[in-house]
């Protein structure tokens, strides 16, 4: 029996919800949960240094297998000593399988039992990604937490298609487990799919739990369904997953969605949302989103969020940040990106305290009254 390199420790359950306070132990340190993970697609969180990420309390970041496989190449990163050394990050790293990018970015993809053939979005060359190749690339990257190769069907795909898809994803997960070269220092998570169909989510969960992964991801959400539909899927999916393993909701970063996921027992989240909207001057604040590029802030000498104690809000005004963005100065994007990332990482710290205090539902109500509720569940 393998001693898993990724371990989950439950510290406390919230009294009135399914929320749980815990920690995840990895070969590169321990981080508290629930946790939001900043996304470093190309082995960097856009415009942020590792030191800045550590300052804001991010104990784990995500890197993207598809992008790093294409450029600079996983074998080059292995020669550098792995992703941690390559990017000078000494805490935990999670890598996705590359599957989502194949389906969302690549052109002319063809899915078969063996894997996916597609056109490289950088140069148009023909590529092939299989469950075994996805694991091999991640083994070379050396991340602490890896993802099984899966298909991510659209939420409103027909039942028969989704059923075939989850059955293939289960077979791919089994193949990935067999191909995994480093089970003692890299933890491989299975990914539960099934769109909005309860019986298919149950079938997918049963298949993957029987394979005894060290953790489980919930995929196929935040892909066009409403907020209520996502909550409903979590309501019937999370209870199917083991209590002694981490639960990761993939691609979710809207603050209200994070809180609703925690209430249902989810531990980990990631999303490009905070840095993507920051590049357009959109900032998350205690009172909802604020587009600091708007003319209304040209002479506003208050912080982006007066209730925030991040580096940006302690040192700079809305007027100054607006000026930087209007002048296309990179420092402006650095400041808005830092603020948004800090906002979500700090939100999770406040959520953890609410679990300790057994008042998470009250916290949610107070937060949403000020921030707003994103019923469409759009990440953009």
Swiss-Prot record:
Q: Which GO terms describe its molecular function?
A: metal ion binding; tRNA-guanosine(34) queuine transglycosylase activity
* Active-site residue numbers: 96, 270
Q: Copy the pathway line from the protein's UniProt record.
A: tRNA modification; tRNA-queuosine biosynthesis
* Cofactor: binding details: Binds 1 zinc ion per subunit.
What GO terms fall under cellular component here? cytosol
Instruction: Give the EC number.
Output: 2.4.2.29
Highest taxon in the source lineage? Bacteria
Q: What does the record give as the reaction this protein catalyses? A: 7-aminomethyl-7-carbaguanine + guanosine(34) in tRNA = 7-aminomethyl-7-carbaguanosine(34) in tRNA + guanine
Concerning InterPro entries, the annotation shows: ArchSynthase1/Queuine_TRR, TGT, TGT-like_sf, tRNA_ribo_trans-like
The protein's required cofactors: Zn(2+)
Annotated region (RNA binding), positions in chain? 251-257, 275-279
Annotated GO biological process: queuosine biosynthetic process; tRNA wobble guanine modification; tRNA-guanine transglycosylation
**Which top EC class is given?**
transferase
Chain positions recorded as substrate binding sites: 96-100, 150, 193, 220
What this chain does, per the record?
A: Catalyzes the base-exchange of a guanine (G) residue with the queuine precursor 7-aminomethyl-7-deazaguanine (PreQ1) at position 34 (anticodon wobble position) in tRNAs with GU(N) anticodons (tRNA-Asp, -Asn, -His and -Tyr). Catalysis occurs through a double-displacement mechanism. The nucleophile active site attacks the C1' of nucleotide 34 to detach the guanine base from the RNA, forming a covalent enzyme-RNA intermediate. The proton acceptor active site deprotonates the incoming PreQ1, allowing a nucleophilic attack on the C1' of the ribose to form the product.
Q: How does it assemble?
A: Homodimer. Within each dimer, one monomer is responsible for RNA recognition and catalysis, while the other monomer binds to the replacement base PreQ1.
Family the UniProt entry places it in: Belongs to the queuine tRNA-ribosyltransferase family.
What name does the UniProt record give this protein? Queuine tRNA-ribosyltransferase
Organism whose genome encodes this protein: Streptococcus thermophilus (strain CNRZ 1066)
